[in-house]
Amino acid sequence: MLKSVNILNKRARFDYEIIDTYTAGIVLAGTEIKSIRLGKANITESFCEFSGIELFAINTYIEEYSFGNQFNHKSRSERKLLLNKKELKSLHKSVQAKGLTIVPLKLFTNEKGLAKLQIGLCKGKKNYDKRESLKEQDTKRDLDRIKKAYN
């Protein structure tokens, strides 16, 4: 049984309002998938960009595989994302027209052991929106504490 890997981009939910989510496959080298299975990846500073009709994840950090030889991968390189043509067209259209952006939300392995990247079509939050979301989190946390105390 394979150990599942979940690497989250916690910053994305704070900085962006997520409109829609998609699950995409990633084109990886052998040493890259081995590093991901060990949990040695980071997607907090990464973003997605179109090059022609293809979508790439840029600035995704996957640590070099410790047992690799001279044919090891680069830690920060563009990685092609695999989506249906219909999904790519709709994403491309919405990014061009509405000023939205595509941000990686979660890097995980599925039940077959393949690496997948959950991406979100997002709109940037303003500073006052971020403050409001912080206030909502604080009030929710306080309510949970009160409920726990009386139960």
Swiss-Prot record:
Xref: PROSITE patterns: SSRP
Record carries keyword Phosphoprotein: no
CDD domains attached to this UniProt entry: SmpB (cd09294)
Superkingdom: Bacteria
One CC-aspect GO term: cytosol
Transmembrane segments: none
UniProt keyword list: Cytoplasm, RNA-binding
Predominant location category: cytoplasm
Subcellular location: Cytoplasm
Gene3D superfamilies noted in UniProt: 2.40.280.10
Database matches in Pfam families: SmpB
One MF term in the entry's GO annotations: RNA binding
GO annotation, biological process: trans-translation
Role according to the record: Required for rescue of stalled ribosomes mediated by trans-translation. Binds to transfer-messenger RNA (tmRNA), required for stable association of tmRNA with ribosomes. tmRNA and SmpB together mimic tRNA shape, replacing the anticodon stem-loop with SmpB. tmRNA is encoded by the ssrA gene; the 2 termini fold to resemble tRNA(Ala) and it encodes a 'tag peptide', a short internal open reading frame. During trans-translation Ala-aminoacylated tmRNA acts like a tRNA, entering the A-site of stalled ribosomes, displacing the stalled mRNA.
Family: Belongs to the SmpB family.
HAMAP family: SmpB
Protein name: SsrA-binding protein
Lineage: Bacteria, Pseudomonadati, Bacteroidota, Flavobacteriia, Flavobacteriales
